[in-house]
Every structure is written in structure tokens, then in C-alpha cells.
Amino acid sequence: MNESVRSTTPSVIIIGTGFGGLCMAIQLRNAGIETFTLLEKASGVGGTWRDNTYPGAACDVQSHLYSFSFEPKHDWSRKFGLQPEILDYMQHCVEKYDLAGHIQFNNEVASAVFNEATNTWTVTTTDG
């Protein structure tokens, strides 16, 4: 691998921008790691909360428990938050922790193959 490729290759690839992906990205930032990329197959963040927009879609866990411990939300409008409010919270986290520049939207992972000899992963997207 030449130096120019190595310098632009992320040291961490996070698949998806649901709660798990966003949390990992924020924790990497908190640890001082900036060489990460989130690959998101859709055009926006949110995972299940982006995809499930049916009437009445809501959390089945009390809202005050449904936020990151390091970014609590105390002003939920309901005991069990509705999908739009949860998605807004996730977007708030993307903005507050400046993650947008690390996200590649419309970029679906096709495969991830580990090479034991080099201790590296090769991640391929549907676009190549």
C-alpha cells in the first residue's frame, strides 16, 4: 500500500448510523481517534428509527433511558418517545459531536473479509 492511500484509509470502519454506530463514532472521538468512517446504506442517519415511520412508531423503553449516558435527553415529550423525536435526538448527536464529515451515505457494505496474515480487514461496498 502506498503512503497516499494509507494516509486516507480509515483505521476504523463503522457499519451503520444507528445508535450503535453513532455511539462507537462518538467514543472514538472521545478517545482521540479521528481516522474513522461510518458507512451508511441509506441517505440519512438513524437505522431502525429512520426506516420505521409507520403511525405510532415509538420506543418500548421509557424515553429517559433511551439516550446515550454521556448525552442524556431530559426533555422527552412523552414517557415512550415517538419515532420522530428519537430520530431528532440522533441527528442532534451527529451535529453536536461533528460526525457528518465522517459519514458516507448511500454506501452499502457488500462484504468484509479479514486477512489473518496482515491482521487487516478488506471492506467492499456495493459501489466497489
Regions found by a protein language model. Name each.
Residues R78-G128:
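Feature captures the FAD/FMN-dependent oxidoreductase FAD-binding
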Residues T8, T35-T37, D51-N52, V61-Q62, ...:
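FAD-dinucleotide binding site
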Residues G20, S43-G44, A110:
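Short, solvent-exposed loop/turn segments at secondary-structure junctions
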